[in-house]
Structure formats: C-alpha cells, structure tokens
C-alpha cells in the first residue's frame, strides 16, 4: 500500500499530508489558482483545499454553514442538508498559530455530475479554518459519493482502499503554512 505523503500546496506556500492514491487534478485539467484539488485513483472521492476571501459577516458555526451552502449553489445542488457542525480543537491543527476558529461540517448535497441528468446525494465533509489576519477563510472539502457511484472497485483495485474520514482529518490537521506572502502584502 502506498504511504501517506506530505505534499506542497499552492506552490509550496502550504503543505499537507495527502492520503494514498491522491492524484493532483491539475495534472488532468485546469484548476482555479485559489484551489488545490485531488482525486482518488480508483473511487470518485475528491479532496479540495480552497483559499477564499474571509466572510466576516458570518461568525461561528454560521460561517461553516455559509460556505457549505455556497458550494451547493456553485454546484447547482438540488438539495442541501447540513447534518452536523462542530468546533475543531485549535490545538490539534498545525495552523493553530494563525487560525482564530475552526469548524467541521458534515452534510449532503444532491448534485448531478457534468452532462448527467440524474442528481445523486453526495456526502461532504468540510473543515473551515478562519485566518482573519490574512483576510482568508481556508475551506477543505472531502467529497464522498455514494458507493454505487464509485468507479470500478473490483478485486484488482483493492490495493488502494477508499479514503476515510480519518484521511480527511489528517489532511486538515497537517495543513501547514510556510509562506504567508501567498496572502499578498500585509
């Protein structure tokens, strides 16, 4: 089995531990500059790290809900349902020195893939790390499609198991800032 690895993000300004089987989507298609996107080699799971403008008009768990609903709007979700929102313990984060508050949200969105009519429920886990000194909301998303959506999980592909919530938590807690200049001049 392929080990987890520390991966540079945003040109080395950040790094994080990615789970086994993570493929950098920017090697396959264009990805916006404010995002790092990774997909599982076998399943349809994906991990997204986004640098977003701080949404100072929402605070606490409402900020996590705001970003979840915003993602639903961008994806033209037919239904958006928040299941849980909980604070993240800052001491567990590599970014604890610059993260003022952090939230983890789990929910479902009913979305149709590109060029498909049928919308299916996808489970999303999101971590919101708020960095007000950089005017930034860092949003990490773990997309978990339903099992029947997962690409060919035959015996030949069992060497790379589907990602777990633990893999996502490792990404969130290991995310490290190396170069604050990514946020522009202070």
Curated annotation (Swiss-Prot):
GO molecular function, one term: small GTPase binding
Membrane topology designation: Peripheral membrane protein
Biological-process GO terms, alphabetical: heart contraction; protein transport; regulation of membrane depolarization during cardiac muscle cell action potential
Gene3D superfamilies: Mog1/PsbP, alpha/beta/alpha sandwich (3.40.1000.10)
A Pfam family reported for this protein in Swiss-Prot or TrEMBL: Mog1
Localization: Nucleus; Cytoplasm, Perinuclear region; Cytoplasm; Cell membrane
TM helices/strands, residue ranges: none
Residue span of region Interaction with RAN: 27-70
Record note on quaternary structure: Monomer. Interacts with RAN, both RAN-GTP and RAN-GDP. Competes with RCC1 for a common binding site on RAN and thereby inhibits RCC1-mediated nucleotide exchange. Forms a complex with RAN-GTP and RANBP1. Interacts with the cytoplasmic loop 2 of SCN5A.
PANTHER family in UniProt: RAN GUANINE NUCLEOTIDE RELEASE FACTOR (PTHR15837:SF0)
Protein name, UniProt field: Ran guanine nucleotide release factor
Species, as recorded: Bos taurus (Bovine)
Gene expressing this chain: RANGRF
